[in-house]
Curated annotation (Swiss-Prot):
Entry remark concerning the domains of this protein: The large subunit is composed of 2 ATP-grasp domains that are involved in binding the 2 ATP molecules needed for carbamoyl phosphate synthesis. The N-terminal ATP-grasp domain (referred to as the carboxyphosphate synthetic component) catalyzes the ATP-dependent phosphorylation of hydrogencarbonate to carboxyphosphate and the subsequent nucleophilic attack by ammonia to form a carbamate intermediate.
Protein name per UniProt: Carbamoyl phosphate synthase large chain
Species for this entry: Streptococcus pneumoniae (strain CGSP14)
Residues that hold Mg(2+) 1 according to the record: 284, 298
Record keyword Manganese present: yes
Gene: carB
SMART domains, per database record: CPSase_L_D3 (SM01096), GARS_A (SM01209), MGS (SM00851)
């Protein structure tokens, strides 16, 4: 069926900010879909609140609205644009829920907007637990015994009839939010209560647990002519019971018989046909390893995290084709862009194995609950491709960037057998490493399979890896064993460890004996047809399929898996850099390991290498491609950390040179540079042990800010008030050493702001200054940023511009740099300089209309700012006000404290833009799901040093009609200043404490600040947790509360008697 001509204008809803469970895979899907629809000649209108994505670039759609994805704003845009149709299936759960809401409120009917892709009835049938159950019964598809409940008591009664363990699944939530496995009634009560609150329809499904079955996923596609096919099946290494987003996954599935595959394939295709989905869909099934019994777990009627993985694993572009199907094209009419010759109706065939390993944020959240279950906790993932399981698994391990280069964490060797077995059974984020350690200690695959229900097939592979380790240890320098190890994915570093030599010597031995990798093409058809995709992975075998072209090339290093502190913003910069390299006439080569992102879409670059970002893997590509140079400044800390070893190996680093990178990162060199340039910084010193730190702090005076050097995202940074706290920090938080000193700085409480600058070595372009709403002390990634600045004097802005120019030229910066300043009493201090692209690049690029990463890349390749038409200095300001606001994923991370400080905690961001500060703030708060009703109660629980300031806020809240509640000390302080607040108990005061008020819905916002002492603030933590669990707006910085007040004041009227 040809494409539809009765519709011209289509609105696409994006997925909003990145949160755990909904990450960069939707930027990739949305970008593909918008371009795919434009290619077919439709006018595309995009709504998405996330500025950090490629998807919200002007070129991606005909009209791009970076506005909140809420009923209020989406309705406005629908009325203004009057599209014929709406495509919501590429915006994750956010897009689907928005479509449901628009429909339920009658907006789609009123405006005559048709829904494309998936009908509302199908969304309902897949998402509403009751309707899903009915449909499965009609199709005679087995599902676990279950019951829908709306109260905790109903849940307890049902569990009594089927027995524990049971699983709780709230309806219409994302990434298993609020769900979990319950072994007894106490856990069931707790999880169901929370699940009912988080479900928008107050509904949970209680089902019999089938934990221990194999978890299999099928990624399927269907068109309007009822053609349907399986793109790819995938098998979880971890059995059912751990969220698939937190599981290690292999594609294609490895342990199913032909009969089992056929059985589950038929089930998946019959489900997508029954739901009449036009586009992509993901079906999750549980297979009993001991019989042919299976259950359908769930269906996602949309593009998902698994579809991004399936697209990258097979090369089959699911989102692109889903968009074409949505407008009426059929699979037998669309050419598969990978082969360029076969139709999309051919099912992909793979002649390799793909491994995906999730990346968790527990390096930032040491207190977080690491036990894995049905609620997702990973922030990102890595993928690796190999010719066997061992190779793809080990390549994926070293892609994770958690300080491992093999499937082992050396520290685990010291763990007792009891602890080891407990960690093997009770899965945490690092279970793979504990299982591998158990094998090294002689536990058999059979014993481990019995304990974990992991298929023995995979455990045999781990045993095989261990056997190769022993072989290597027994035969140093043996070329045959070396070849075997390389065929199975071993890194040079691991081999060097086992041989007691250096990585360099192993590399030399390999090169001398021509033991080098070949690169194979990902072609969707197991080499049956000719393919034209420049998409490669390395393996040790024969026949290299990646041919170096005659054109001069430039290699760009990506930023690896998404984690807190290094998010999709860096992928954004990478993609823009590639565009500029191509525009300059070079061949652009990308190397990255993240399957969720736009940069690993093979149509973005001239060549894509899907490889770990380690020195060895990067050098292998450089040896083959011989590029003009490597660009490291867009790949975050990942790429910057590779600059030095690459330069030592003789590779040309394009842009700022290694010595200058060092001057910005190394504390003593940086201080020296600032002295020479006559730029003030807060007084500070470096310390390599506890005594030195105490001495430095006494000299500088408390409070001090302490942190390790060379980190991204403020890891292990703290503000300490006294010597006792400082000593405790030095003992527990960091491993200080002469190689890794700790920085001790005077902590200046002032206004913070940051600048991104682009330099060609002579001139410096400053696109804009961003002013932070929160004072210094909250990590810049967690602060709300305002552009253009609203409170900085002209003099301060000129000083900032002057210091920025001096720094860029003085540090010989070529390309991008980011500088953070703090201002106190009109004096400007430099806090830090990052000689690379920062996380504010996408936001600032969008609000100033300067494609910053592209400009920087052109300068790196030799053009000048004046040639590109840019002036030296600060770029003219925008007339509108733009705000970048952080978004957090605390609901997903139990035991993580939501208090903001110098260590970054946000996972994503949104943008609000309007004519005034108040309106822009309103949009930013709405987009980040911080919605405050216009009346109700605000509770204050404030540390002594901030009570004065809080009093003023409380008065303003009272003036616009809010009730004020406060904890004992705060209430007494307010009363002594003539403001009566209703006192509330802190914690444990039965039904008079804050958490019970929150549960009863009597509190609309919580304002809670903490002193800077390092004492455990358990009460405060419980109060903050109760706010997170019940979705009550929580402010841990008075500046943010003040910003919210500005919004409320601008929207409220004062009513007074005359």
């Amino acid at each position: 069926m040809p494409k539809r001509t009765d519709i011209q204008k289509i609105m696409v809803i994006g997925s909003g900010p990145i949160i755990i469970g909904q990450a960069a895979e939707f930027d990739y899907a949305g970008t593909q879909a918008c371009l795919s629809l434009k290619e077919e000649g439709y006018e595309v209108v995009l709504v998405n609140s996330n500025p950090a994505t490629i998807m919200t670039d002007k070129e991606i759609a005909d009209k791009v609205y970076i506005e909140p994805i809420t009923l209020e704003f989406v309705t406005r845009i629908l009325r203004k644009e009057g599209p014929d149709a709406l495509l919501p299936t590429l915006g994750g759960q956010t897009g689907l829920n928005m479509a449901m809401e628009l429909s339920k409120n009658g907006i789609l009917d009123e405006l005559g907007v048709e829904l494309l892709g998936t009908k509302l009835s199908a969304i309902d049938q897949a998402e509403d637990r009751d309707l899903f159950k009915q449909l499965m019964e009609e199709l005679e598809q087995p599902i676990p015994e279950s019951e829908i409940v709306n109260t905790v008591e109903e849940a307890v009664a049902f569990a009594a009839t089927i027995g524990y363990p049971v699983i709780v699944r709230p309806a219409f939530t994302l990434g298993g939010t609020g769900g979990g496995m319950c072994a007894n009634e106490k856990e069931l009560r707790e999880i169901t209560e929370n699940g009912l609150k988080l479900s928008p329809v107050t509904q949970c499904l209680i089902e019999r647990s089938i934990a221990g079955f194999k978890e299999i996923e099928y990624e399927v596609m269907r068109d309007s002519a009822d053609n349907a096919l399986v793109v790819c099946n995938m098998e979880n290494f971890d059995p059912v019971g751990i969220h698939t987003g937190d599981s290690i996954v292999f594609a294609p599935a490895q342990t199913m018989s032909d009969y089992e595959n056929q059985m589950l394939r038929d089930a998946s295709l019959s489900i997508i046909r029954a739901l009449k989905i036009e586009g992509g869909c993901n079906v999750q099934l549980a297979l009993d390893p001991n019989s042919f019994k299976y259950y359908v777990i769930e269906v996602n009627p949309r593009v998902s995290r698994s579809s991004a993985l399936a697209s990258k694993a097979t090369g089959y572009p699911i989102a692109k084709l889903a968009a074409k199907i949505a407008v009426g094209l059929t699979l037998d009419e669309v050419i598969n862009p990978v082969t360029g010759s076969t139709y999309a109706m051919f099912e992909p065939a793979l002649d390799y194995v793909v491994a995906k390993i999730p990346r968790f944020p527990f390096d930032k959240f040491e207190k977080g609950e690491r036990r894995l279950g049905t609620q997702m906790k990973a922030t990102g993932e890595v993928m690796a491709i190999g010719r066997n399981i061992e190779e793809s698994l080990l390549k994926a391990c070293r892609s994770l960037e958690i300080g491992v280069h093999h499937n082992e964490i050396p520290e685990l060797a010291a763990v007792s057998d009891d602890t080891l077995i407990e960690k093997v059974v009770k899965a945490q984020d690092d279970r793979l490493f504990y299982v591998s350690e158990a094998i090294r200690r002689g536990y058999t695959p059979e014993e481990i399979a019995e304990l974990t229900k992991i298929d023995i097939f995979y455990l045999d592979k781990l045993l095989h890896i261990f056997e190769i380790e022993q072989e290597l240890g027994a035969h140093p320098q043996d070329l045959e064993v070396l070849k075997t190890a390389k065929l199975n994915g071993f890194s040079d570093r691991k081999i060097a460890e086992l041989w007691g030599t250096t990585d360099d010597k192993v590399r030399q031995l390999r090169l001398e004996n021509k033991i080098v990798p070949v690169y194979k093409m990902v072609d969707t058809c197991a080499a049956e047809f000719d393919s034209e995709t420049p998409y490669f992975y390395s393996t040790y075998g024969w026949e290299n399929e990646s041919i170096k072209s005659d054109k001069e090339s430039v290699l760009v290093l990506g930023s690896g898996p998404i984690r807190i502190g290094q998010g999709v913003e860096f992928d954004y910069a990478t993609v823009h850099s590639v565009k500029a390299i191509q525009a300059a006439g070079y061949e652009a080569i990308i190397m990255n390991s993240n399957p969720e992102t736009v940069s690993t879409d093979f149509s973005v670059s001239d060549k894509l290498y899907f490889e770990p970002l380690t020195f060895e893997d990067v050098m292998n590509v450089i040896d083959l491609e011989q590029p003009k140079g490597v660009i490291v400044q867009f790949g975050g800390q990942t790429a910057i950390n590779l600059a030095e070893p690459l330069a030592k190996a003789g590779v040309t680093i394009l842009g700022t040179q290694v010595a200058d990178l060092d001057r910005a990162e190394d504390r003593d060199l940086f201080e020296q540079a600032l002295k020479e340039l006559d730029i003030p910084q807060p007084p500070g010193q470096t310390a390599t042990n506890e005594e030195e730190a105490a001495l430095a702090a006494r000299k500088i005076g408390f409070p001090v800010l302490v942190r390790p050097s060379y980190v991204l995202g403020g890891r292990a940074m703290e503000i300490v008030e006294n010597e006792e706290d400082l000593r405790s920090y030095m003992r527990t938080a960091v491993k200080a050493s002469p190689d890794h000193p700790v920085l001790v700085d005077s902590y200046i409480v002032g206004q913070e702001c940051e600048v991104d600058a682009i330099s060609d070595g002579k001139n410096v372009l400053i696109p804009g200054i961003m002013e932070h709403i929160e004072r210094a002390g909250v990590h810049s990634g967690d602060s709300m940023a305002v552009y253009p600045p609203q409170t900085l004097s002209q003099k301060v802005q000129e000083t900032i511009a002057d210091y920025t120019k001096r720094l860029a030229i003085g540090l010989h910066c070529l390309g991008m740099m980011n500088i953070q300043f703090v201002i106190k009493d009109e004096k400007v201090y430099v806090i830090e300089v990052n000689p690379r692209a920062s996380r504010t690049v996408p936001f600032l690029s969008k609000v100033t209309n300067i494609p910053m990463a592209q400009v920087a890349t052109k300068l790196i390749l030799g053009q000048s700012l004046s040639e590109l038409g840019y002036q030296n200095g600060l770029y003219p300001e925008s007339t509108r006000v733009h705000i970048k606001a952080p978004v957090f994923s605390f609901t997903k991370l139990a035991k993580v404290d939501s208090l903001l400080g110098p260590e970054m905690k946000s996972t994503g961001e949104v943008m609000g833009s309007d004519a005034t500060l108040e309106k822009a703030l309103y949009k930013a708060f709405e987009a980040s799901y911080l919605h405050l009703p216009t009346f109700g109660n605000v509770v204050f629980t404030i540390a002594d040093d901030a009570k004065e300031e809080a009093l003023n806020l409380a008065r303003r809240f009272q003036n616009i009609g809010y009730g004020i509640l406060a904890t004992e000390g705060t209430a007494a302080f307010f009363a002594s200043h003539g403001l009566q607040a209703q006192p509330v108990g802190k914690i444990g005061d039965d039904d008079k404490d804050i958490p019970s008020f929150v549960r009863k819905g009597r509190i609309q916002a919580i304002i809670n600040t903490v002193g800077t002492k390092r004492t455990a603030d358990e009460d405060g933590e419980q109060i903050r947790r109760s706010a997170i669990e019940h979705g009550v707006p929580l402010f841990t910085a008075l500046d943010t509360a003040n910003a919210m007040l500005k919004v409320l004041e601008s929207r409220s009227f004062v009513t007074e008697a005359i």
